[in-house]
């Protein structure tokens, strides 16, 4: 049951990713997905391996963050409301 929760934690941000227009929000979702993957991996394998993997993810996300800050300076943060409701409804249906 715990494995199913972690897998849904990895799937939910993928559905939510299509509703975001801001690259910074996408980086935040990437961080959430990597954190869920590391927690899941830490529960089934060595916690040291999961910790090192998380540090590598954070390093990659920092490089992406710097790149996005240089390229796109003035994006407006916003959500597409109808797609968000559709994807949240799909995730709730999957979880029930």
From Swiss-Prot:
Q: Top enzyme class of this protein?
A: translocase
Cellular location(s) = Mitochondrion membrane
* Catalysed reaction, written as an equation: a ubiquinone + NADH + 5 H(+)(in) = a ubiquinol + NAD(+) + 4 H(+)(out)
What is a GO molecular function of this protein? NADH dehydrogenase (ubiquinone) activity
Q: What is its EC number?
A: 7.1.1.2
Q: Which UniProt keywords apply?
A: Electron transport, Membrane, Mitochondrion, NAD, Respiratory chain, Translocase, Transmembrane, Transmembrane helix, Transport, Ubiquinone
What is the protein's major site of localization? mitochondrion
One Gene Ontology cellular component term attached to this UniProt record is:
mitochondrial membrane
- What residue intervals traverse the membrane? 24-44, 48-68
Q: How does the record classify its membrane topology?
A: Multi-pass membrane protein
Please report which protein family the annotation says this sequence is part of.
Belongs to the complex I subunit 6 family.
The entry's function note states:
Core subunit of the mitochondrial membrane respiratory chain NADH dehydrogenase (Complex I) that is believed to belong to the minimal assembly required for catalysis. Complex I functions in the transfer of electrons from NADH to the respiratory chain. The immediate electron acceptor for the enzyme is believed to be ubiquinone.
Its recorded name reads NADH-ubiquinone oxidoreductase chain 6
């Amino acid at each position: 049951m715990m494995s199913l929760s972690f897998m849904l934690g990895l799937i939910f941000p993928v559905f939510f990713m299509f509703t975001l227009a801001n690259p910074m929000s996408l980086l935040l979702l990437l961080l959430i997905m990597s954190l869920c993957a590391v927690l899941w991996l830490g529960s089934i394998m060595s916690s040291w391996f999961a910790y090192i993997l998380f540090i590598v993810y954070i390093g990659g996300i920092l490089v992406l963050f710097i790149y996005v800050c240089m390229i796109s300076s003035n994006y407006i943060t916003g959500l597409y409301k109808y797609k968000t409701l559709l994807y949240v409804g799909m995730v709730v249906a999957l979880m029930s």
